[in-house]
Amino acid sequence: IVGSYTYVYDYAGVLTDETMEHIDAMNASLFAQTGAQILVSVVNSTGGADIMDYASDLGNSYGVGSAERNNGVVMLLALDNISQSGLMGDYCVVVGTGLESHADDFMSLQSYYLENDFAAGEYDAGVKATFDAFIAWFADFYGVTNREGYIPAVRETYSSGSGYYYTETHGYVAPALGSLVS
């Protein structure tokens, strides 16, 4: 449904529909293949809460990522928060416990792809570039193909030789719909 987003919440109104649709479509493909999800949230303020705690709470309340793998990621921008450096605006990324050993990768990607656009007020461009870098990281990490609309078809087939069912996966292009509940 256009205008109804599952993986992105823009309470500040700075992201384009195109970017939000892209985030949803790519997340649906990522989730179908790996159970991983990237929640993107843009708020005006965290209401005085620590930005990392706020992001962690978002991830936990939405159930981001696979419960078995704990491979969810939350990218949060708080436009009116005061950063640790004293500047207006702050952002962070938090990862599930299954990705904790890779947290530095995500922080480095966010710093590299978001910082300049964030400082210039180009939030949409920065979010999209950072999100795409996260998607590329996951694709490499799990060895999967990730593109809009690509959701692998999973089919159970009965083997008369062994008497067991086995799973076959074939790629196909389909409308991408996702869910944050795994």
What residue ranges belong to the model's regions?
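Folded, non-transmembrane soluble domains that reside on the lumenal/extracytoplasmic side of membranes
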Residues: 1-180
